[in-house]
Design a protein with these regions (language model features):
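Generic hydrophobic transmembrane alpha-helix motif, especially the helices
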Residues: 61, 65, 71, 95, ...
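Transmembrane alpha-helix signature in integral membrane proteins
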Residues: 71-103
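Glycine-rich helix-loop "coupling/hinge" segments at transmembrane-helix boundaries
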Residues: 134-137, 149, 164-165, 214-256, ...
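Short cytosolic juxtamembrane segments of multi-pass membrane proteins
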Residues: 266-283
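Short helix-to-coil transition segments within interhelical loops
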Residues: 64-69, 107, 176-195, 236
Length: 283
């Protein structure tokens, strides 16, 4: 996209309520996550049993957990861990899925058939169930969570890339590129990818939200981020036995997940409407 087009998208976005609302929520959560890399009110690795389960107050704005750790600090570091896993998983899925989709649409034949059958098999299982099963098979840990969540992102990007690029290969400018002697790989890099980038960005935003949910799910089951590193799913798991006398320990990470997922979905819907006028909805 050139600079003029980016400016038009930005101006359209400022007048789109879903885009603005989603952008504000997403920037808020991303800011907390990034801030945790350089500052948190308290260390999340320091326990203070004497100060456990304190209610929100002047020293601990959101209270403390059953180990005396500051809940706000836990939420901030948990935001980074959850979002980093989700982003890395999207990168893995896109890195494999996009070339698969391009190869299928460019080569057709048995390659296209094999990619489509792989997609059909992958979509036969719910995404979260797939992530949980793969995490259980690979073992607990953030890296294995990235691999597990990334694997269910592969068919998403492969199918979207294939569907978006099929019609482009029949366009006149692609035929002209072939006549000019350009190979398939060069055509994909110079002509196909730039024309489907907007669609891929929108899908990546939606997958980011799903990745946060998936990471929370596998961490809740003890298969994701491991102690002493906090994550929103792990915080929910640890708080479930304390709901009646310390409900904030479960409500706060739950709200963080909801706000992040809601913000990303609103942002994705807004980007879809702005980048694809045919999908624009009346507000």
């Amino acid at each position: 996209m050139d600079r003029k087009r980016l400016q038009e998208i930005w101006e359209d976005g400022l007048h789109h309520r879903s885009f603005v609302a989603g952008g504000i929520l997403t920037v808020l959560m991303l800011s907390l996550a990034i801030l945790s890399l350089i500052w948190t009110p308290y260390s999340v690795f320091t326990m203070n049993i004497a100060g456990k389960l304190q209610p929100p107050g002047e020293l601990h704005w959101l209270g403390t957990d059953h180990f005396g750790r500051d809940v706000l600090s836990m939420l901030m570091v948990g935001a980074w861990n959850s979002m980093a896993v989700s982003l890395a998983a999207i990168g893995l899925g896109a890195l494999i899925g996009i070339p698969l989709g391009l190869t299928a649409s460019a080569r057709k034949g048995w390659i296209d058939e094999a990619v489509m059958r792989f997609n059909d098999f992958a979509f036969a299982f719910p995404a979260l169930l797939t992530a949980v099963m793969l995490s259980a098979a690979l073992g607990p840990g953030s890296f294995n969570s990235i691999v597990a969540i990334g694997i269910f992102n592969i068919p998403v990007f492969a199918r979207l890339t294939r569907g978006s690029s099929l019609s482009l290969f029949q366009r006149d400018f692609i035929l002209a590129a072939r006549i000019a002697g350009k190979g398939t790989t060069r055509i994909c890099a110079e002509h196909i990818l730039p024309n489907i980038t907007s669609v891929l960005i929108v899908q990546a935003t939606i997958q980011f939200a799903l990745g946060i949910l998936a990471e929370a799910g596998v961490s809740y089951l003890g298969l994701g981020t491991q102690p002493p590193q906090p994550s929103w799913g792990k915080m929910l798991s640890e708080a479930q036995t304390m709901m009646f006398f310390a409900p904030n320990l479960a409500i706060l990470p739950g709200c963080a997940i909801v706000i992040s997922v809601l913000g990303l979905n609103l942002l994705g819907d807004g980007m879809r409407d702005i980048l694809d006028p045919k999908m624009r909805t009346r507000e």
